[in-house]
Amino acid sequence: MSFTFNWPRFSDQFHYDAMQMLNTALNKGNKPPIIADKIEVVELEMGTQPPELEIRDIGDLTVDQFRGIFRLTYAGDAHLVLKTKVQANPLNHKQPDIHLMVGSGGMLAAKQPLVVPMLLRLSHFRLSSYVVLVVSKQKGITLVFKTDPLQNVDINSTFDSIAVIQKFIQREIEGQLRQMFREDLPGIIHRLSQQWVKAKVEAPYLSKHPPPPIPPEEISEPGDYGEEGEFPFGSPPNHHSLDPDPKIVLRPSLNNASIHQLSTLSHSNHTLSPYTRSLSHFTVRSVPPRGIGPSGLSASFERQPVKAKRKRTYRLGGRKPPPESVPAVPDSPERASSPIPPSEFDESDMDRYFRSYDDHSRPPNIRQYRSHLHPS
């Protein structure tokens, strides 16, 4: 079984993220004493030649996840450029393996620190190792090296003219690279793959544009209810109809008078107050309508009042006693302007149940009471 790798030019965002992660990995932990400043990645190029994978074992193979053991071989043209500052005075460096002045009789250099900038170029990587590769659509890519992958790397620096320093830098950089392949590179690949998986998931939604804002609809006036857009009261309105230009918009009117009337109506329903203002499209059963006709009263006032269902009248005599004459009280000018609707209670019942002050002041006449029970 063979694989064909698609190894295109990586995006600028990928290079930027990889450089930031390499900066963090190279400056982690204790650096050699010859390094006098932080290590910064200046240039990163992934090259044009892909690595080679030889299948050794397939452990898990599903639609969303793949796990296998491979033999990785890479001999491409990728390169890396680093920038840092080093301690150039060999006597200030306490390593016994640097002997720059071998054979000198007694000539010594100054023991003052001498920090100079340095550029490092790492190229011609040769990698060969057994790796465990796990590819998951949800968790990303996990790559673990089972053996030391670094076989060879060419390191060019500012001090290539000095052979001793060039060998020392070569040895130090190779040690740092082996540690990075073993500890830091699997984490870098995993974090980069998580960003790649996240971009794959979010990519279909990036092409979708948000829906256009809904234009503000006009608020209908009370006079618009009689037009074509009015729905019949026998059937409820269809709120899900796709009418491009609705005539009626079910929104509260921003009228202070209407709000005040609704507040009065709500207050009267809570307190059972009969003094409620009449509202259009509302029916209040506490009082009859207050419309005034040409005769001074409404048409409902001219007919006989309907007595309440719970009203009960108890009469002790066989016939209704003649009503007592009540002196007419002249109406005041204020009352003459507003006619009073007829009462639903009989005056005889009111005289019987609500007696005058004189009747309450003296004891009742038993004979008169009996005469009412047994009329002659």
UniProtKB/Swiss-Prot annotation:
- Regions of biased composition (Acidic residues) lie at 218-230
Compartments where found: Mitochondrion outer membrane
Q: Which domain of life is it from?
A: Eukaryota
The record, for PROSITE patterns, names: SMP
The protein's GO terms of the molecular function aspect are: lipid binding
The keyword Transmembrane helix is assigned to this record: no
**Membrane topology field:** Multi-pass membrane protein
Q: Residue ranges of region Disordered?
A: 207-249, 286-376
- Sorted alphabetically, which InterPro entries does this protein's record hold? Mdm34 (IPR027536), SMP_LBD (IPR031468)
Residues of the SMP-LTD domain: 1-194
CDD domains associated with the record: SMP_Mdm34 (cd21673)
Gene Ontology CC terms: ERMES complex
Composition skew (Basic and acidic residues), residue ranges:
350-362
Alphabetized UniProt keyword annotations: Lipid transport, Lipid-binding, Membrane, Mitochondrion, Mitochondrion outer membrane, Transmembrane, Transmembrane beta strand, Transport
Main localization category: mitochondrion
Question: Where do Basic residues bias regions lie?
Answer: 306-318
In the record, biological process GO terms are: mitochondrial genome maintenance; mitochondrion-endoplasmic reticulum membrane tethering; phospholipid transport
Domain description from the entry? Lacks alpha-helical transmembrane segments, suggesting that it resides in the membrane via beta-sheet conformations similar to those predicted for other outer membrane proteins and porin. The SMP-LTD domain is a barrel-like domain that can bind various types of glycerophospholipids in its interior and mediate their transfer between two adjacent bilayers.
What this chain does, per the entry, is described as: Component of the ERMES/MDM complex, which serves as a molecular tether to connect the endoplasmic reticulum (ER) and mitochondria. Components of this complex are involved in the control of mitochondrial shape and protein biogenesis, and function in nonvesicular lipid trafficking between the ER and mitochondria. MDM34 is required for the interaction of the ER-resident membrane protein MMM1 and the outer mitochondrial membrane-resident beta-barrel protein MDM10.
Instruction: Name the protein family.
Output: Belongs to the MDM34 family.
Subunit architecture:
Component of the ER-mitochondria encounter structure (ERMES) or MDM complex, composed of MMM1, MDM10, MDM12 and MDM34.
Q: What is this protein called?
A: Mitochondrial distribution and morphology protein 34
Q: Which organism is it from?
A: Laccaria bicolor (strain S238N-H82 / ATCC MYA-4686)
Gene, per the UniProt record: MDM34
